[in-house]
Amino acid sequence: QGSPNYGEGPVPEAMWISEVTFYCQAGFRHLLMSGVYERFPKLKYILTESGCGWVGDMLKQLDRIDIGFKHGSIGEMNYQRMQWVLKDKPSEYAARNCWYGASFPSKADLNGIDEIGEDRVLWGNDYPHYEGTFPYNLESLRLTFAGMSETRRRKLLGLNAAALYKFDLAKLAPLAAKHGPTPAHVNGPLPRDEIPG
């Protein structure tokens, strides 16, 4: 992802975690704006560990830039010699070619899901990293997914990944039945006194 080396100072992990999404977003922007998906229309790009709450706003920004270039309204900048390579809007390439692996997303992170499409988001728990949700995966799921429709929840928690990676759901069914969780496990809200401290 191109993150810098933060060295041995007192807070390198804090610096890294505060900027990690920036570097993920940079690659995402570069691929969308450079015409990669125009040249490789079957390419699938999956961002992981960067959430998805920011995607809708970024796609709106990139679409505005695209329109500006196509209609010559970028302001005082002169781009007449530049050949614009995008036939479609950046948001249209994202809708066809991009997915978002949201590691232990919060409810706020999923607020913009309708803008990017519920079929584009994949849940993750970031195991075995210490900042992930293990061993409190079920509690995390309840905090985020309680009250969400079962159809949407099933898509985010597994069906989207199964479709993207072409998993054989019939072969995976025994494992899912053994290891869960079931809809009943995650549908109820998590009371404050059950939140791990």
Regions inferred by a protein language model and the residue ranges of each:
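Histidine/acidic residue-rich metal-binding segments in metalloenzymes
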Residues: 1-93, 107-119
